[in-house]
């Protein structure tokens, strides 16, 4: 039996409160723009309105976040992107739990047989631990080494 942390939320863009949206943008900016030096124009890509947002609120912050990108937007299959855990919440199993919850949601709510993602190479082991397999050579995205991975569902 898996014991899950409380406070996981899964919402469409128009279901997010302004406070939640602000928290998500702030966490994404902290991780992707400040830590990883990705430029704002690449991080804020205009797809959020089409996505489903998975996040964990802890200590008044969005501690962990990812988004589900519908089939046909970016990839021909459904995809998971913008995966993050704030620095102070890392190394606690939160990312793996979030991916498991996200994949369960996709399996229950979408008719697709594959989930695709563009993984930062340093996080490859995390994605493999929840069943993803690498399907590409390493490539650069926003100046960071990535590889395409997928999981059959």
What is each stretch, according to the model?
Residues 85, 91-104:
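Conserved acetyl-CoA-binding loop-helix of GNAT-fold acetyltransferases
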Residues 116-118, 128, 133-148:
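Conserved catalytic-core motifs of GNAT/GCN5-like acyltransferases
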Residues 44-49, 72, 140-141:
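A short beta-turn/loop motif at secondary-structure boundaries
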Residues 98, 123-126:
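Conserved short alpha-helix immediately C-terminal to the canonical SAM/SAH-binding motif I
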Residues 71-80, 90, 109-113, 142-145:
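A conserved beta-turn-beta hairpin within the catalytic core of GNAT-like acetyltransferases
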Residues 2-43, 48-53, 57-61:
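Short amphipathic alpha-helix that is part of the acyltransferase structural core
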Residues 55, 61-70, 77-84:
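Conserved beta-strand in the GNAT
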Residues 99, 106-119:
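Conserved GNAT acetyl-CoA-binding A-motif
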